[in-house]
């Protein structure tokens, strides 16, 4: 299991780097369709950072595979739906947000137990 934990730690670090890159893009280069788009982007970025940090803790939990998969997939679905809507104004994939959020909750529970 040490290899699995190390893989999720690496994924968390890469995700954090990606979150920082997106934060820079959102602050300096992005063209948002409206003020709500900027707010949505910032919300996605905050969650992206937070859950990247959570992935760094996966190797320390009792069920690293479950916790890592739930956190990684939840972060992807939740943040991607927000980033996409923020940048495009298209709401067609916003239903992925609650699915991703539910996976994130389960991921945090997997970290705890």
From Swiss-Prot:
The chain crosses the membrane at residues 64-84, 93-113. GO terms for cellular component: mitochondrial inner membrane. Residues 30-63 are extracellular. It is found in: Membrane. Keywords: Acetylation, Membrane, Signal, Transmembrane, Transmembrane helix. The keyword Signal applies. The modification N6-acetyllysine is found at residue 43. Residues 85-92 are cytoplasmic. It is a multi-pass membrane protein. Residues 1-29 form the signal peptide. InterPro entries: DUF423. PANTHER family: TRANSMEMBRANE PROTEIN 256 (PTHR43461:SF1). Belongs to the TMEM256 family. This is Transmembrane protein 256. The lineage of its organism: Eukaryota, Metazoa, Chordata, Craniata, Vertebrata.
């Amino acid at each position: 299991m040490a290899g699995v934990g190390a893989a999720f730690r690496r994924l968390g670090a890469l995700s954090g780097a990606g979150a920082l890159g997106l934060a820079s893009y959102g602050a300096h280069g992005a063209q948002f369709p409206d003020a709500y788009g900027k707010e949505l982007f910032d919300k996605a970025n905050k969650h992206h950072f937070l859950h990247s940090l959570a992935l760094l803790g996966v190797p320390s939990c009792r069920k690293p595979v479950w916790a890592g998969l739930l956190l990684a997939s939840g972060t992807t679905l939740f943040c991607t739906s927000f980033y996409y809507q923020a940048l495009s104004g298209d709401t067609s994939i916003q239903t992925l947000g609650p699915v991703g959020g539910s996976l994130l909750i389960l991921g945090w529970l997997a970290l705890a137990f």
